[in-house]
């Protein structure tokens, strides 16, 4: 089951290169709703609110080779508080240098300022009366280095002259799984209420794995759950939770209640994203200028994230959306999934602008910098040059 990322904006011969050779090659700096870039290594000096009610604190986390959730676990442990007391505006990947705002409830500034965790820096601690919510950011600034290039002077000149103003608004590989792109497959099984297949796909089905992880997944596929538990390591906490819950209740649906609700929602969201990516592919041949029947956002045609309350476009875009629904044999009402969430369906632009795009070659390194609005993927931009998603 592919992830449906097939088309390109740039008409060019793509080049091989190494992305993310070092964490410092992929810098992600969060941009606040007010447009402030949380620059790496820089104090911003956010001002405390004048009349603080003693509730909320926001702070910037700069981290190297930490994803958002693992960094948060360490911060929770260091402050001796609970995960539910914290929030963040957006998630960031691991193998990178990233900045982002976190929010917390019921802590003192000193508790945060005194934290000492390897490769994590906390700064810009600010007293506020506002809760930081998911999505509470404008977007991100990316600075990306692609190494190990072997290009002629002519090729360098050709690529340096390219200008990229917008990109196809695909959901990136991160939505489906970097190592094992199976999140959307699990989501489809959950939509179909085939929780047994969802369980085996997530815990078994080895892809690109070796050693204990490979053997553990093979044991799951053979039904040897207790043996598999002994081989899954600390990086497979969710697989272990699923198996333990299944062994306790002997019910595949009940097993998924051991996972965080956000993760269970992400499975179905990934299936919706997979279908959306296919809409982009089918619309590509018609172009992305406005056509009769389009539903627009910021004067840009949108596609639907299919859910129980989906409103179809008219015209050609509507035909594309309905064709996918019919081919997948979807019953929209089934996107109300007990214990997993109600996936009502929304709309998303099929192309998205790139802001402040710059590129340069230096010492056989191709460096890109640009800004994207929240919910958009930098690897879709780099893919335009390299053809690779990771």
UniProtKB/Swiss-Prot annotation:
Keyword annotations from UniProtKB, A to Z:
Isomerase, tRNA processing
Under catalytic activity, the entry for this protein gives:
uridine(13) in tRNA = pseudouridine(13) in tRNA
- Give the annotated active site: 93
GO BP annotations, alphabetical order:
tRNA pseudouridine synthesis
Q: What is its EC number?
A: 5.4.99.27
Domain TRUD residue range list: 166-353
Q: What does this protein do?
A: Could be responsible for synthesis of pseudouridine from uracil-13 in transfer RNAs.
- Cross-referenced PANTHER family, in alphabetical order? TRNA PSEUDOURIDINE SYNTHASE D, TRUD DOMAIN-CONTAINING PROTEIN
Q: Name one GO molecular function term.
A: RNA binding
State the organism named in the record: Methanococcus maripaludis (strain DSM 14266 / JCM 13030 / NBRC 101832 / S2 / LL)
Q: What is this protein called?
A: Probable tRNA pseudouridine synthase D 2
Source domain of life is Archaea
Q: Its family?
A: Belongs to the pseudouridine synthase TruD family.
């Amino acid at each position: 089951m592919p992830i449906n990322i097939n088309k390109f904006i740039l008409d060019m011969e793509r080049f091989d290169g190494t992305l993310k050779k070092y964490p410092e090659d992929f810098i992600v700096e969060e941009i606040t709703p007010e447009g402030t870039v949380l620059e790496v290594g820089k104090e911003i000096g956010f001002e405390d609110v004048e009349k603080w009610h003693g509730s909320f604190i926001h702070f910037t986390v700069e981290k190297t080779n930490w994803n958002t959730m693992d960094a948060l676990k360490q911060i929770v442990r260091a402050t001796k508080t609970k995960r539910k007391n914290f929030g963040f505006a957006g998630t960031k990947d691991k193998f990178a240098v990233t900045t982002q705002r976190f929010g917390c409830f019921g802590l003192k500034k000193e508790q945060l300022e005194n934290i000492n965790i390897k490769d994590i820096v906390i700064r810009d601690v600010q007293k506020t009366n506002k809760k930081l919510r998911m999505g509470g950011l404008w977007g991100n600034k990316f600075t990306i280095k692609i190494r190990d290039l072997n290009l002629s002077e002519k090729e360098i000149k050709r690529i340096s002259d390219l200008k990229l103003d917008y990109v196809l608004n695909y959901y990136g590989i991160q939505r489906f799984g970097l190592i094992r792109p199976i999140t959307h497959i699990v989501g489809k099984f959950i939509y179909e209420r085939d929780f047994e297949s969802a369980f085996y796909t997530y815990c078994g089905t080895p892809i690109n794995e070796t050693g204990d992880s490979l053997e553990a997944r093979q044991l799951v596929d053979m039904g040897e759950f207790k043996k598999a538990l002994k081989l899954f390591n600390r990086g497979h906490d969710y697989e272990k939770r699923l198996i333990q819950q299944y062994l306790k209740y002997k019910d595949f649906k009940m097993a998924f209640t051991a996972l965080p609700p956000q993760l269970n929602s992400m499975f179905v969201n990934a299936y919706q994203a997979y279908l959306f990516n296919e809409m982009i592919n089918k619309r590509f041949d018609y172009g992305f200028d406005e056509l009769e029947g389009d539903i627009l956002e910021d004067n840009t045609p949108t596609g639907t994230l299919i859910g129980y309350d989906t409103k179809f476009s008219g015209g050609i875009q509507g035909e594309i959306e309905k064709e996918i629904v019919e081919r997948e044999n979807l019953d929209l009402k089934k996107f109300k999934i007990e214990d997993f969430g109600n996936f009502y369906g929304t709309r998303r632009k099929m192309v998205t602008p790139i802001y402040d795009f710059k590129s340069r070659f230096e010492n056989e390194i191709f460096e890109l910098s640009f800004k994207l609005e929240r919910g958009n993927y930098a690897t879709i931009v780099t893919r335009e040059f390299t053809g690779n998603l990771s």
